[in-house]
Structure formats: structure tokens, C-alpha cells
């Protein structure tokens, strides 16, 4: 009985600390450190030495206001967020990036329901081609590398790209299917102006997709990654590319989002 009481008291103490940190504690000067301590404890990261919290997001930030002027992009379905989707604000950022780069060809890795695909189509010229690559459900058992366990449900969907099916803008979209680790990108070499990477979030796949996209992006083109701050495999891979590969030294994390971007 005493053990159960101790557990209950411990739970109440943790709940109190979390509640304070996420409310009144946010007003304090040490709020960021406190949040990082909680984050690191939940993710099994133990700070060393002076117990300074470990911030896993090392890529420099850029302010969204440095990227755009007035928000003139058109949006469709931005309020219909859910698991696996970009947020409303992220979708607006991506839409504005597409408008700013005015691409002739966009290549997307990871179609899912096609919400971002549709909005990129709506915010690009009528002659822009959007190619979107998705792993079919039947390909789950034969991927070249392992995907994250939590991603299986995003692959096992009834329809890929259902958001843009039947939409007038769908005429600009070409769906292709396969595993990005074994897909032949040769047809698209040096022909892509904007690439959006939102496929598997496993470390090896993020490295693979980033490398593959580098072979198809034109000089002056834009690479966009989603979920930099949401999946350990993504931030680990992008941090590594930023620190070790000169080609990726210009990556920036757009503040207030999980988006990272690189002008090639």
C-alpha cells in the first residue's frame, strides 16, 4: 500500500512540475532550460558535466519575416490538420516558398494524403509540374532500409493523394510510386527547382533522400525538409549533414516550424 502511495505522490510531483513549467514557468528567465531538461529526460538524454540541458536543434534559425513580404499565397485545406500533416502555419510557409521560387518542376518525397502537394500546385504557375513519390502499402515488406515503426500507418492508407484527386489543380500533379532508396531519379537529374522531403523519418532514409534530391535539384533551387524538430531520425541526420557536409552548411531552420530549408 505504501508503495502505491509513493508512486501516486511521485506522479503528482511530476505533474505539478510539468504543469508549472508549461504555464507560469514560461514567464521565467530559465524557462527554456527547464523545458530542455524535461525534453532530455523523456528522450533518455542525460546531460553531462554541469548538467547543462542538451539542445538537439543545432541548425541556425531564420525568421519567417526575413523570407517573405505580405502573405499572398492561396490555401486549400489548411485547417484540416492531423497526424502526419504539416501544420496550418507550416503549410502557409511552404506555399509562400513555392511562390517565391516560382518553380517549373517540384519533386516531393512522401505524398501521404496529398494536402501539401495540392497547396504547392495551387501556389505555382499553370505549367508547373509537381512529381510526388510515395511508398505503396504493398512495398512495406521490401523497403531497402527500415522505416520507423510509427510510420507504418501512414503507408497503410486506402488512397495516396486523396486530397488532390478530382481537383482542377490535379492536372499539374504526377504520382509515382516506389521506395525512395531504390527509386531511379535519373529522369529528374538537374531539372527540379523545389524539392520537398517528407518521406520516411528514419535516420538512414533522411540521409538517402537528402543525397538523392541533391542529384535532381538545379543550381539556385530550394530543398525543404519537414519534421526537423519532430523526429529524432530527421534532426540527427540533418544535424550531421550540417556539421560534416559543406554542401549542407547553408541549411536553416525556420523559426516556429519544424521546417528546414536550403538554397542550393
Regions found by a protein language model. Give the residues of each.
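Membrane-proximal basic amphipathic "stem/tether" segments
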Residues: 1-72
Amino acid at each position: 500500500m505504501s508503495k502505491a502511495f509513493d508512486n501516486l505522490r511521485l506522479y503528482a510531483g511530476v505533474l505539478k512540475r510539468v504543469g508549472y513549467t508549461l504555464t507560469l514557468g514560461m514567464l521565467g528567465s530559465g524557462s527554456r532550460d527547464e523545458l530542455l531538461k524535461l525534453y532530455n529526460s523523456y528522450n533518455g538524454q542525460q546531460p553531462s558535466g554541469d548538467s547543462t540541458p542538451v539542445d538537439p536543434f543545432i541548425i541556425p534559425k531564420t525568421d519567417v519575416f526575413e523570407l517573405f513580404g505580405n502573405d499572398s499565397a492561396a490555401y486549400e485545406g489548411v485547417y484540416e490538420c492531423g497526424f502526419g500533416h504539416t501544420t496550418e502555419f507550416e503549410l502557409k510557409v511552404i506555399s509562400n516558398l513555392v511562390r517565391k521560387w516560382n518553380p517549373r518542376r517540384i519533386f516531393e518525397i512522401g505524398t501521404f494524403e496529398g494536402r501539401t502537394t495540392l497547396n504547392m500546385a495551387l501556389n505555382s504557375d499553370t505549367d508547373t509540374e509537381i512529381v510526388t513519390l510515395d511508398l505503396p502499402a504493398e512495398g512495406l515488406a521490401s523497403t531497402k532500409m527500415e522505416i520507423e515503426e510509427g510510420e507504418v500507418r501512414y503507408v497503410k492508407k486506402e488512397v495516396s493523394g486523396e486530397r488532390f484527386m478530382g481537383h482542377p489543380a490535379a492536372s499539374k500533379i504526377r504520382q509515382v510510386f516506389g521506395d525512395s532508396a531504390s527509386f531511379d531519379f535519373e529522369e529528374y537529374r538537374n531539372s527540379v527547382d523545389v524539392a520537398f522531403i517528407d518521406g520516411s523519418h528514419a535516420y538512414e532514409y533522411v540521409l538517402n533522400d537528402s543525397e538523392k534530391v541533391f542529384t535532381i535539384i538545379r543550381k539556385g533551387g530550394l530543398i525543404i525538409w519537414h519534421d526537423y524538430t519532430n523526429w529524432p531520425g530527421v534532426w540527427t541526420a540533418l544535424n550531421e549533414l550540417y556539421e560534416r557536409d559543406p554542401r549542407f552548411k547553408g541549411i536553416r531552420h525556420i523559426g516556429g516550424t519544424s521546417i528546414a530549408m536550403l538554397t542550393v
